């Protein structure tokens, strides 16, 4: 980290890296339980693959008599009411409001996590570079949630992690491949 550049320091209970739906739900759920949260996201809009940038609508597990509930259902109902034509700019606004209306969330958009500070084997701080302000954001927290989609905290911290698919017999998953491989982006089969 270049110390000649501006840095903004945050001290929170939970740092969530990644503002896709998983990161948003983690941040909102924690904030609603009184936890002080910093949400670092590397894009200008929330939602990850479900944002206007990628445009993968939220489908989830649902059928005739069942569907996703909780914060995802809250988003779905708000969208049904305010965005019946499913326009992505409105969708982005609904997601933006969800985060910004939570008083316990400090949102940090356009900020890519690129370094961490460890205390022994525990992450102490996450450091991100915000392109829009040309400054670093340093977030100290007790807990960290890696919802980045690319699992950036694991390699930065030296944690053990898997790349690819597990073999069929590792977890007794009948549709998994016979041998583990390095394929990504999809289901086990």
Predicted regions and their residues:
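Core beta-strand elements of the Rossmann-like FAD/NAD(P) dinucleotide-binding domain
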Residues: 10-12, 133-143
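N-terminal Rossmann-fold NAD(P) dinucleotide-binding loop
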Residues: 23
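Glycine-rich loop(s) and the adjacent beta-strand/alpha-helix scaffold that form part
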Residues: 146-189
């Amino acid at each position: 980290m270049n110390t000649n550049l501006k840095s903004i320091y945050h001290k929170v209970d939970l740092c969530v890296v990644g503002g896709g739906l998983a990161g948003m739900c983690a941040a909102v759920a924690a904030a609603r339980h009184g936890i002080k949260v910093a949400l670092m996201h590397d894009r200008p809009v929330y939602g990850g693959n479900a944002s206007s940038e990628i445009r993968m609508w939220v489908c989830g597990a649902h059928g005739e008599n069942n569907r996703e509930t909780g914060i995802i259902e809250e988003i779905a109902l708000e969208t049904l009411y305010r965005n019946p034509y499913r326009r992505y700019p409105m969708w982005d606004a609904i997601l933006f409001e969800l985060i910004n209306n939570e008083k316990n969330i400090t949102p940090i958009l356009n900020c890519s996590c690129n370094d961490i500070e460890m205390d022994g084997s525990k992450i102490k701080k996450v450091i991100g570079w915000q392109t829009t302000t040309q400054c670093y954001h340093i977030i100290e927290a007790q807990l960290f949630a890696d919802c980045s989609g690319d699992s950036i905290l694991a390699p930065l911290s030296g944690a053990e992690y898997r790349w690819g698919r597990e073999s069929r017999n590792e977890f007794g998953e009948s549709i998994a491949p016979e041998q583990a491989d390095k394929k990504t982006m999809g289901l086990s089969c």
